[in-house]
Curated annotation (Swiss-Prot):
GO biological-process terms attached to the record: DNA-templated transcription
Disulphide-bridged cysteine pairs: none
NCBIfam families listed in its UniProt record: rpoC_TIGR
Domain of life of the organism encoding this protein: Bacteria
Subunit structure: The RNAP catalytic core consists of 2 alpha, 1 beta, 1 beta' and 1 omega subunit. When a sigma factor is associated with the core the holoenzyme is formed, which can initiate transcription.
UniProt protein name: DNA-directed RNA polymerase subunit beta'
Cofactors that this protein relies on: Mg(2+); Zn(2+)
Amino acid sequence: MKALLDLFKQVQQEEIFDAIKIGLASPDKIRSWSFGEVKKPETINYRTFKPERDGLFCAKIFGPIKDYECLCGKYKRLKHRGVICEKCGVEVTLAKVRRERMGHIELASPVAHIWFLKSLPSRLGMVLDMTLRDIERVLYFEAYVVIDPGMTPLKARQIMTEEDYYNKVEEYGDEFRAEMGAEGVRELLRSINIDEQVETLRTELKNTGSEAKIKKYAKRLKVLEAFQRSGIKPDWMILEVLPVLPPELRPLVPLDGGRFATSDLNDLYRRVINRNNRLKRLLELKAPEIIVRNEKRMLQEAVDSLLDNGRRGKAMTGANKRPLKSLADMIKGKGGRFRQNLLGKRVDYSGRSVIVVGPTLKLHQCGLPKLMALELFKPFIFNKLEVMGVATTIKAAKKEVENQTPVVWDILEEVIREHPVMLNRAPTLHRLGIQAFEPVLIEGKAIQLHPLVCAAFNADFDGDQMAVHVPLSLEAQMEARTLMLASNNVLFPANGDPSIVPSQDIVLGLYYATREAINGKGEGLSFTGVSEVIRAYENKEVELASRVNVRITEMVRNEDTSEGAPQFVPKISLYATTVGRAILSEILPPGLPFSVLNKPLKKKEISRLINTAFRKCGLRATVVFADQLMQSGFRLATRAGISICVDDMLVPTQKEQIVGDAAKKVKEYDRQYMSGLVTAQERYNNVVDIWSATSEAVGKAMMEQLSTEPVVDRDGNETRQESFNSIYMMADSGARGSAVQIRQLAGMRGLMAKPDGSIIETPITANFREGLNVLQYFISTHGARKGLADTALKTANSGYLTRRLVDVTQDLVVVEDDCGTSNGVAMKALVEGGEVVEALRDRILGRVAASDVVNPETQETLYEAGTLLDETAVEDIERLGIDEVRVRTALTCETRYGLCASCYGRDLGRGSLVNVGEAVGVIAAQSIGEPGTQLTMRTFHIGGAASRAAVASSVEAKSNGTVRFTATMRYVTNAKGEQIVISRSGEAMITDDIGRERERHKVPYGATLLQLDGAQIKAGTQLATWDPLTRPIITEYGGTVKFENVEEGVTVAKQIDDVTGLSTLVVIDVKRRGSQASKSVRPQVKLLDANGEEVKIPGTEHAVQIGFQVGALITVKDGQQVQVGEVLARIPTEAQKTRDITGGLPRVAELFEARSPKDAGILAEVTGTTSFGKDTKGKQRLVITDLEGNQHEFLIAKEKQVLVHDAQVVNKGEMIVDGPADPHDILRLQGIEALSRYIVDEVQDVYRLQGVKINDKHIEVIVRQMLRRVQIVDNGDTRFIPGEQVERSDMLDENDRMIAEGKRPATYENILLGITKASLSTDSFISAASFQETTRVLTEAAIMGKRDDLRGLKENVIVGRLIPAGTGLAFHKARKAKEQSDRERFDQIAAEEAFEFGTPSTPAEEPQHPAE
């Protein structure tokens, strides 16, 4: 028996729970929480400061004010614990119970809870099936509602005005009952039979056909079923008892001068109590109905204000006219309970100070000011002082520390040793924003930071501050040391590139040391070793940049891998190099060849160097190497003594002439404009074009002049070498500045933009060296100011995007090693406009192969499915010319409630397969959100330079190889023997000798092909040409032209060209046609053969009809003979409006929010043949006949550009009307893989434009979360409702159960939710409530009696548990296993004892109950 008791004791100690349930409280429940009724509105006595009895702060209800002391002072001290004083009625206990004890107010008349009334959709309205307006009229005493119609013709829930009511009473007497106010609504709620209603609704759902009704019923059914399942009674939405918050949570603090500061809640409660007491009195006095009614209405309004002030009517205001802060306001928003106190706590043992550079530190160290350390490590010092016997008590120890005796400093040194601290720089945009360092005590008051970690923190030393936190427990120290130490975080989690890359001075120093000069001092000397070079250099016999020959010893990996053999062996070889490079070779880590250093080290090169070191030599060697590179860089930069002066800015000699020519051209355009030859817009575009070209030309001339300098070589010949100009070196090395900036210093500043983004056509021809005049300076300020305003906006927007991303992915954690799926996506190199934008190797690096990778030549398997493709693997794949690899992806992972390691692949921040427990969702969100501030905010208006560049009229090959056409390419040969493309989506590829795709080009409709399939070509060969300014309509059949509905003045108009004098027919807009009849006709062409019969489409009975669009210029005449491939009409493309491209941050947000673009393109719903039906007003009708012969119609606005023509075969999901794609359509018609490809590519386009690298897998992780809900199509035997959206994992679990029980599973379709919507629709109500729309989320959850299983990270942070990620995941797993074994042990003991005493055994109840 004792064992049993022990176990119970154990359980009671700490509250362990696995879930939290939320529900509506019944009146009895509220009374059971309460410690007494609050009857008076008084708070505290202003003279004695003692709480009034029965008031809002009453000590009898809520507990004593001082620990273990009753109010009147009769009982004091611990010995009376638990006694209730007979004089003042206060229980003697701890004062902190005033934080947890609740009271209640018995309401004289029931009151509706405003959340369930006004939070849309109104829950009360749904349950009662009445409109919100009607319920409000009843609740606020403006109308009666029929409760029981009796034998009268009235209907239940009918609304009637007061006048009506009295008439009906006269007519029917007391045959019927009607009420007003919350009592009436409560009666109605009580009269509802939920089970019956649910049955009726289910049958109605099955039988009804109307969409609107189905939606309405499904919504109501969902709410009613929630009540049914959760056991919550609907009439609890009407309050009879109001709980009162514990007084410590709504404090009243006396200020000096006899005034009080109080929480707004006290005011609100006071109003409720006052009105409630007044109502009680009125009821006792049997006051007239109208007065009572008014008082009841006021009580309802007072309670509304207390719960959610301002939701209905005007907000209640305090004395200072500002709205009072109600209970709802306490929890929602940035300053509410969730975001302010639960997710954003302040941390003890922390400090902050300014940072300064600490170039002498090692990478894992930081300099901590002594005074700061003393304060932060106080408890550790106290402990040490006691242990050492220096101080006897904590008080004495405190004195020692305050006096800062010498022994304290010694102890501080000891305490701090090997105790890492965490440094954080706000804003913490990704996980490298907090790193751990070993502190080194320093004098002064600023924290010293290692220069190489600045990139990760995005810190600089212009006054940035950082915060220090001390991990206290041993576990925390261990985690800080192993997981967060700066030297263990050398790669960016976003893209796997090294984060400890040198920048600025270091780069400049290394670059200067590794440059080579012609005819430097000591050129051509040979040295036997590096030490000899150093000696020569120190004696000024050679210069750093002189070319010399040196014997260099490299440590290479030993081929012999047997036991005891050394890992590296020396290898000596003679290199032609420079003095600087030879000197640098001393710091190369073993395993790297000298060739990696034997080139000028620019920033990119250094980054590549560190990356190579990491992959080849491991983490430790890399960290040491980076540190040494930094030391050398600083030293060499100092030795170099590079500085810049005005003379370094060389203004090109040709500048005047270039600018003069441009001005002449501009004058010429002005003249043309004046004489009316060009429009104002054309003139503006041309002027802007000329100036941007000029500015480029000046820049080019300047760079040519800057980048080389004349020099005499050893043989006395004059040659040119790369320049040693300081400004040029800074930009070229990547240390600071860019070609654009140099162009502004020494070339010309060029065109400036107005704040609205349009370009000012007057350029700034001066540069900073020559100086700007007043007008030029003014134009400059215009753009600069806009830049600053933009930056401020951008930061806020970017932060909000990150917050939404984190919220949608926060519960995605790697929970298992392998889900065993064989699905994946096919990865190809990303090609755009013929350029390889991203090579295949970059896209598959660090992924797991989904199917075997096979050598195309020998057909042998190189890598089996399930292999992690590392650097060597991708190099093999690239070498063998494999151009497509199927890899696992987060999108197809079959793990429920998480991801598996194989589908995710490599953890980019560590360089190895991701660990179980890694919070990959948050990392993905951070990786996408962190560079958000670098993206632009603006929408690009295509105009001027941009649009001119976009007009291409031919496509040429960039590499040698063989031309291949895709399957969609169709072309015909015309009379001249030219091949004319008649497909809309044809592409030409160039493949190399082993069949690998090298480039791919879209070839537009109507282009002339110059090379055919299979042709061998050289780089630079033209593949196709076309007219960029018009879009042709081409016939695929020959014959005689027969016009239909082509009537001058009705459907077409004659246009006479001013210049040539020729007339052409142009199709006019429907809106401009005169008569009603002519609006529906469509001008078109039929073809007649030699016998005068209409030419039919081969294999069908349809005649060939070729329709003309609005604006088409008809180039053939009626009755003219045409050949195959001839042009019938041309549509000028100038008429296409230039679309604004949404760029930057707004575009990323738009994609992740899955917004349907306005004027979206239309995709074909089915595979079939197109034809045009009868046009309606302003719309044209496109019909697709599928293979079964069913017709699908699309109505398309006339101004839209239809991409298909009559009788064309289209595939499902192909675009048929031009416009931006709608992601929802892509998902529906092309599936998940196509959708993910679309979103990934579009997001990457935005980031690539800014030069930001993000790995695809992060975007895929977000897309997975956007797809995490499915819509039920047919519910089978499951508990779901058709049309309901449910979590995919729940759906699959439920289906598994159905299949196991032999019932019908549900069918579903994927739906795409934007990130905000996805966050709000998560299963965890705690997470959703802390994100946005707190009220709505909590209302819904309470009605459903939702249970939060605490799966995600956010919920666990809020309830204060370890998060189920990283070490926390292991902790929770272990805890659950232990609980399981405890339970088994418990059952076993119970069984044994039952056996002993002969009583029947009962299995133990589970000790966990969801916490209410």
